[in-house]
Amino acid sequence: MSSKEVSTFRLYLMRFVYLLNFVLLGSDVWPAIFRHQGAWDPVKGVAFSFWAALSLVSGLGLRYPLKMVPLLLLQLVYKAIWLLAIGLPMWSAVRSSDLAHAMLIGVVVDVIAIPWTYVVASYVIEPGDRWRRQALGARTYRQNA
């Protein structure tokens, strides 16, 4: 198996994570958005908007699990940052929460589901997209036949 190939099991595992996001996160966030009354706290509004978008776009991951890998990476990174910046101080102060446990489980699930060999091959080793229409120094010549 090449570094760009992903096992069928891993594809189904990724689809399971996307499905969890779509169904569980969506069923929690969307009703809260539609039933909310009054003005939102701006920071809380950003968080709910982000989670709503994450749940919605996760639906695409069911059909295109590899194309949506950046979504899983984003999810992993935001949860890891939350655990380090907010969760760790809570645990240090012996004030653990259900949210901290959910974030920790989410990080573990993301680390297991993400096809790391594919990520390295696609986003680290493979050359990036060009920045210009034409590479610097490249010239096009018209051949006269």
Tell me what each language-model feature is.
Residues 85-103:
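Membrane-helix boundary connector in multi-pass membrane proteins
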